[in-house]
Amino acid sequence: MIKFFSTNGHQERVDFKGALLAGQAPDKGLYMPESLPILSQEIIQGFPQMSYHQIAYQVIKPYIGELVAEPALLDMLKDAYSFDVPLERVYDGKYLLRLDRGPTCSFKDFAARLMARLMQYFLKEEGKSIIILTATSGDTGSAVAHAFYGLENIRVIVLFPEKEVTERQRRQMTTLGKNIYPLAVAGKFDDCQAQVKQAFADPDLAGLALSSANSINIGRLLPQAVYYFYAHSRVAPGGEKVVFSVPSGNFGDLMGGLIALKMGLPVKQFVAATNENDEFPLFMQTGRYEPIQPSKNCISNAMNVGHPSNLARLFALYGGQMDESGRVIRQPELSAMREEIYAVSISDEETRQTIKDAYTRHMVLLEPHGAVGWAGLQRYLREFGDWNPAVSLETADPAKFPDEIVRLTGINPPLPPAMASLDEKEENYLRMAGGYASLKEYLMEFF
């Protein structure tokens, strides 16, 4: 069975269940698999005939081993992935992978829904309960809240930066109630994420059975490898190499793709497209990593991350080490990274122009995050020449970002059914000022 180690070097190895329920390693590191299983080409060549949940089983089962019986895991996957995953051809072998058809219209649904089912399975097995503490820059909170909504033995606390989420993103978190507790933080996403990490490391809270549903949790990360295999099976059934362009904020999505690559997926290269928070593209150019503090406010708000947590995993994948503060302890193999990743930073101006161009040229509505990915792909094709097939990830429904889209295209994106009644529901959330001390006081008083 595959064991998981901490990126901060903690010696103890845990199985998938231990890593999933802990969320973060005791030394504040992130869990990474000690080895990555390689899927045979025979298995991968069978994927074009498989459904999404069948592909997911092949990709995820090696990490879980015998911890979940085959029928139970298949049922969870079928239940988690009951929605369509369309590939939209834009032009000449260039596709959009639409990851916005889940219940909260965001790619975060793919990871959150499976993780919720796995956590509930393990908790029921042991008769335990847990508190999920998670930070969001926009879409994670709603996906996690909906995935865990109403589940027994699990309470969910979501921290979000009050002034940096759209009204619809906020309403998706604050209109649920029951076991969901949203907290509006006076600050940025990085502040929310730092408070969550501090809570995990606080000995005073050790009795609370805290876990995370951010992409610091390995249970969020591994399901993200699946949609790369799925997309490849649909656009390159003959096994050709594919270019993937990935809008990148906290870098969980890119890590999912890199894990798929290391598991045997034929990939030409990944485009890591960030917004103006360009700490990673600068690192790829110079070899020096400097977090951006505070992060810059861009219209692709879910990617306003000045120090992406998953860089610790990315560095580990290439033989390096980074601690939770962003300090580089051991440099990764930069030449190997550059062979597999092309990193670009896309300005708000270019993002807006991309939204306009996609609509006028192709009648495609992109929201700001998907536009960053699409702009990154166009930059790649200009620099390295045409490549087919190429897939860019569209990570959220345009209806989540109506203001920019109406202003740029004149089109008011239609509300998907999952969001249609949001405006009528009552909101319920707490405002939290005062940094970590306020969060700690809240946790100790109410939980």
Model regions and ranges:
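PLP-dependent amino-acid enzyme catalytic core
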Residues: M1-F447
